[in-house]
Amino acid sequence: MPVLVTDPFIRIRVPDGTTAVGLQDVLARSHDGTLIDFPGMRSDQRAPVVTALAVLSHLLRRYSASPLLTSQDWLDALQSQLGDALVLAGGSDKKPQFLQPVLVGLGDIKPFNITETDHLMAATRHVLKVADVATPEMALYALMASTWRHHGGVGHPAGARSRLLTVLVGDGVTIASEVASLACAYDMMTPNIVGTATRKPGRIRDHMLWAQPWKTEEPVAKLPFPFIDCRRIRLVPATGGLVSAVVVAENGTRVDTGTGNIDDPHVPIQVSTGGPYKLAVKRVWSYRVQHAAVAGSAEVSRPRILDLAPAYSSVRISGIGFDKATTKGAWEALYRIGRGKKMKLGQSEGNRLSELSSRALAVVHDASGSLYGPMLQPYPKRLYQKTSALYLTRAQSLLRDMLGHASLQTILDLLADPPDTEAEQRTLNAMAAAALREVWREATAGVRDPLPAARASLQLDYQMRDKFGEPLMTENASTPLGARIHAVLYDMDAHLSPANRASIRSAATELPLDAWLALAAAPPEDMERPDTRQVWETVVRALGGVRQGGPGIGAVLADTRYPEARVSALLRANGDALIGLIAEAVRWLVSHEVERCTLTDIVVLGITDARGDSAAREEAVSRIALGYARRVRRDRAAA
């Protein structure tokens, strides 16, 4: 018994749940907005399936005498206009099947795996594996995507829509919105290439090349607009309600598309060649490709659907990468427009979007370039030149990944606001700065020596302020631990008289009573633990000669010419070694008669190390290193 596309085997997701319907219900729900998704459809098949449904619904409505509103209306239109060509599998060999030409007389008919019917190419190293049979639903999706396949070698020519990169518009949720928007764009299209040398078509079958006798490489100018072509493939029934495929493996495509442009409204076009913009050969999926697909560029014309479709709130960019009969991958990106506001990216909005895109791409380029010098700073050139280059490449790649999608989403959101060049640039700069901070945090996390990392941070901070007007290091909000230690140190300092300080300074190994009285202000839990108590005992000796307040410990160590190697050792040490180096730094301050110094960070360093709080410890290390590096840099600049 033949399988018809009007039989209820297509699973759809609707507001009430999931159900199985025929093609007429799919078309009806596409136009009433209740079709949410196809659970059985792969994501890479979305653009081909939406295109097939949009072309079909556009043509059915064009050649119908009355509006198509209900499922029964669509069924009547399908039956009256396509008739026996609604058979998916099991029809007469001498008549066309849905999306399948008559193969009799075209050559040897051979069995064909159902996977190769689709547009992806199966292989042992691909996710997609070869299958000989499939359900009617899977086979239907494969047929709709069939002519999107590129040339697959001898006997497997490409289809007319081979590997098109597409831009679909809708509400960002339902597939119905994308089908209806694209169908409306076809309604409004005036073709420039397709059908320019042919008579006006009179019926839907004129557009369905699979419903006509096979012609090899028929010029696109002689075909009606729009059309659905085919490959030399047919489905045949298999056991268990499944279907398999047969093929005539001959060269020669059904359509000679010339440049490849067949006036599809959702396809960006290359300015230089007039052909479709594709992910071919060296062009890979990237943020630049996505910007060009939606905003256009000097090399790419925006797809006309952005002007022709009714107001929409999202754009979906899809593409398949390929090279020499090899599928590289499938990519898709969804973007909100105007913060969810329904609008059209028409001529005026399109021009503004194009200008915003140029500025956003420039910001991404500048942000990536900002990493060059700073990323090479933490690594000695003689030993780690190759290593630093690898880290630089990784950091720039990570930054571009973060900014790529964000840059296009940001400018699409800005369309909801009135034009304001300065405000827009501030938004773009803030976006770049936020990404640079995150990438830099990860990039420097593995640097063993904090001082070179601090110098690199200062270099990046300067570049960010110069290019984006944004700092790398935002104002440090005091942590609860830091605030508490800061308050304790001020309390200790306030209660120490000159006599108390003299007593502490003159003490040898044992702390005097004055020191223990000062230590009474320390947190009890720290004094109960030997490791944290040692930190407080060491720092109270500093208060014998140094007042709490003024410059940070890093800046003071730099001012007193404390050796850089000792600072690095201090910041990298742990446990008892750290306590010893803190004591050494304290003695250095006292011996150099430092009058005022904010000791908070060095206490936080010791306490967090003892507690095993690595995150808080790294923050303290960073503050000390930055203070030291900043003061050294200032002194060298002044020299």
Sequence positions of predicted segments:
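Cys/His-coordinated zinc-binding microdomains
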Residues: 135-138
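Basic, alpha-helical nucleic-acid-binding regions used in initiation and control of genome expression
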Residues: 152-153, 477-542, 546-639
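Gly/Ser/Thr-rich loops at beta-strand to alpha-helix junctions
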Residues: 141
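Flanking scaffold residues of small Cys/His-coordinated metal-binding clusters
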Residues: 129
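Extended alpha-helical scaffolding segments
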Residues: 1-124, 133, 144, 149-480, ...
